[in-house]
Amino acid sequence: MMKKPVVIGLAVVVLAAVVAGGYWWYQSRQDNGLTLYGNVDIRTVNLSFRVGGRVESLAVDEGDAIKAGQVLGELDHKPYEIALMQAKAGVSVAQAQYDLMLAGYRNEEIAQAAAAVKQAQAAYDYAQNFYNRQQGLWKSRTISANDLENARSSRDQAQATLKSAQDKLRQYRSGNREQDIAQAKASLEQAQAQLAQAELNLQDSTLIAPSDGTLLTRAVEPGTVLNEGGTVFTVSLTRPVWVRAYVDERNLDQAQPGRKVLLYTDGRPDKPYHGQIGFVSPTAEFTPKTVETPDLRTDLVYRLRIVVTDADDALRQGMPVTVQFGDEAGHE
């Protein structure tokens, strides 16, 4: 009779263990949450000179690690240095002309113009008097009609010269016209724009790395004459590291921007990387062939971009990654 309570006690213990184990399994499943499969994004960029010319030197080769701001290569600078000097001279000329237009005319120039008017007035008065006398002589048939016509022509020419001198004096006294000043200003601005372009062209004859990365290919060698935009290097961008994954509509609410996740690779199954969802595509697409999850292959899915916050050199582009959602990842 004593054995019966013992058996009952053992049964209770076993039942409690089963319940606890089931709860632990269920809780672990809840904590593990959503699992996705993706790949480290392959990000490459073709680097080129924005201007054309002869390649003077290349500072890196295939396989080299490069840093943002590093000089990678240079074209022959001489043509661009000459163009820059010409542009600077053009600005100087245009600036001087504009300054003259703003300053107006000097007192000496106005005095000279006034003297020219007096001289032209005297010449006109003489020509007019001479013409008047010739008219009287022609009426008395002392001179020919041709002589009278010559006197009229001289008078008209003197009158035109006087008007031109008067107009010039009037302009000198009133200063340059607004239209002339505006034209000089526009010429100066055009010369300044040409100078800025020449400076930019000289700057762009040096190829600078836009970001950190690894040089994949070197397409040309020193001495090559390139057209503008011709590819010189292909670079794999190493930072930031992005993981591309896909989620179906059922689990879309778990993949919100800012959500933290754990990232596992085959080489580090017990030491995950940490990431944060940076982008969720607003439109669905058919599942790409690269998606490994069988139950997603026929679904419409949404693309995720996950930014790896603690990436190192072991995380290579194209590498398969397991993305783990869960309370631990979400609250780290």
Curated annotation (Swiss-Prot):
What is known about its induction?
A: Repressed by the transcriptional regulator CecR.
> Which parts of the chain are coiled coil?
145-207
Q: Can you tell me where the transmembrane regions are? A: none
Gene Ontology CC annotations of this record: periplasmic space; plasma membrane
Where does the UniProt annotation locate this protein?
Periplasm
Keywords, A to Z, come to: Coiled coil, Periplasm, Signal
Q: Which residues form the signal peptide?
A: 1-20
- What Pfam families does this protein's entry cite? HlyD_D23
- Which InterPro entries does the UniProt entry name for this protein? CusB_D23 (IPR032317), UPF0194_membrane_YbhG (IPR022936), UPF0194_transport (IPR050465)
Q: Please describe what happens when the gene is knocked out.
A: Mutant shows increased sensitivity to chloramphenicol.
Role according to the record = Could be involved in the sensitivity control to chloramphenicol.
Q: Which NCBIfam families match?
A: PRK03598.1
Protein family according to the UniProt entry? Belongs to the UPF0194 family.
Protein name in the entry: UPF0194 membrane protein YbhG
Lineage summary: Bacteria, Pseudomonadati, Pseudomonadota, Gammaproteobacteria, Enterobacterales
